[in-house]
Amino acid sequence: MTDIPHGRGKVRQRIRELEAEKVELIKRMEVLAQEFQQAFRRPWPAHPVVQRVAGGYVYVRWRLQGRNGKQNYVDLACEAGQVLLSNLELPVRNIYVRYGQQMLNLNVSHAVRHGEWTRLRQYLADCAVLDGYAHAGASHGNDA
């Protein structure tokens, strides 16, 4: 568990570090998806894509070959993913599993950093609100 850095300057510094780490992780996600697409010829039963979702979270996910513009995703650990894997030849299955593990690692790394980044930003915002009350109380005297 990460402790809150002492001092708001250190919190801001940690936020900047987290931002840089998140950018690096997203680059690694994009490289992983590109490597897969360069290593395998179409059509793929599924391929990794980087997806940005609300709230700033970014994931690399398996996109199934869609029809009519639909973009369905699959998790290799769920039932549909297991069916997909079981239909692949063993060497290809092993490659999909290897990519899947790398994707899981990148996704959890990004999610943990994004969660910490979000909480630290909220911490600074909450401190600013409380500072406003502290300064208002000091300038108006103690009315309590």
Predicted features, each with a name:
Residues M1-A144:
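Conserved glycine(s) in the ABC-transporter nucleotide-binding domain "signature"
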